[in-house]
């Protein structure tokens, strides 16, 4: 009973929800064998023909290349591309590619030389002698990708499966209308396909290998059964024709009864799926040593006179293939890359064939029908009934139209396979698939921006953390350097600080020399000043013999004598037994220098200007004022009360001054006035000003 149940389950197939049955339109192209197309004069090979990043260029403009020569290097998910024929690289530049908007992508442009020479090919006929890793690396470096439409790198897919794969499924359903590339390939190359399947099974080591094919391909089924007649490791499952039974999740459910979870992959349930065209490319890469440089493309539609399936070199312009098929375009001719439900119209025909190009449909106007106006959704739920992914297309439509990305994501818009079944059954002619494609593109753009922002935030936070660590390390170093010394070192440090403070205090105090202290130079300084005063008095008393001066000035002599006598008395008092007040030698030196400079200046001015007439009365008054100021300075300069003035000396001095004044008046009245000595007058005035300033400074010092 258990064996009977196992046998029943072995051949059992399941069904999936939804699906439609559109006209197949396959007989236009599946009746003729595969044929070759003449080489195009120029090939455009986009660097990115797969899911993932483009490879690194390894050719330059002007290089000569051979068929099968690598144009890029593949690392990780970067799949290399190869030259489709021999020729010369004439440009490496952006070119419009197979995209609904014909976006420009970096491409290598090759001018064919017509020789179509291959590189040296090295096949592994005994592939079982090579390791799993070596086989995967060879498949990857030979540019094999999923040829069923997704374009995922086959080597990466095999590497990611690992030991989790229990079921290998070969997708031979080819459910979309018009497309017969896989059907014709199975009819003409069934043995090579089965050999490629065995290579995949050798790499994955699954428990079972299943081939799923729709029952509308009787010739292909017959060819596969003939090849698999003696095989027990591969099972052929014929399934009912229903669109989209060729979808990966749908075919998995049909053959195994398992459903791929939302947001998951088929490998999560132990299933890995490959297309029959991919299996054929694996065989050519491993056994024949040929990179993928061509694929089968269906040329169909009522606008071509020779529909069929051809071996199209990758990079061949679409226009070249259609012209070979007898393309007769109408006024508003449309050319669709892919099928009528999942394909997209080409903006122009200069785009190249790539690895995921399986069909070029050129329908007539009557074949496609007139475009109908889009109307409002009537919420009939026909789209939900037809959806094979169990989604709610009408809700996704509202979310997409309203830019409600969060709600669209919550309703699993990412699980939409864009099969077009919802748009096919919509009575309002709403292009639902276009809305869903745009919404998924916007969500992907938002996620990419969020990823970039998160990476930038992570970099910023890492930098901040690094700066904080460096700051903490600096603080720790400073703290360790500022550790208090031991107790035995405290006394030495305190003594050193005391010495430093004492030196600073001594440096800030003015240098003052007290009388009687050692060394005491006050007496010497006073004697020197007295001698200088006596010399000046004698010089003033005896006129200088000069040819330009006729005689002395009695008024000036009187003034200078009085000043000299006052200074002499001051010097006597300072040189006496009483202690003298402190003398600041720096101030004395400064004042003496100022006096000498002013005297020299006055002499220079007196020598250049004419002397003014001298008034004897004014001279007497000035002499008296000078004597009074001198006595006042003596009183202020002393630290004790001023000594009493000798009246006799004062009387004598006054009498002498009066006599000199009368004599000068008489001489001035009886004889013509002689010209005054300008130099002596200037010197006397300078001395008077200096002494007055000195007295004022001394008074300020005493007050302080």
Swiss-Prot record:
Binds 2 [4Fe-4S] clusters per subunit. Its cofactor is [4Fe-4S] cluster. One of its GO terms (molecular function) is electron transfer activity. It is a peripheral membrane protein. SUPFAM superfamilies: alpha-helical ferredoxin (SSF46548), Nqo1 FMN-binding domain-like (SSF142019). The keyword Cell membrane applies. [4Fe-4S] cluster 2 binds at residues 387, 416, 419, 422. GO terms for biological process: electron transport chain. Residues 534-682 are annotated as: Disordered. Its main location: membrane. [4Fe-4S] cluster 1 binds at residues 377, 380, 383, 426. It holds the Pfam family RnfC_N. Belongs to the 4Fe4S bacterial-type ferredoxin family. RnfC subfamily. Part of a membrane-bound complex that couples electron transfer with translocation of ions across the membrane. Required to maintain the reduced state of SoxR. This is Ion-translocating oxidoreductase complex subunit C.
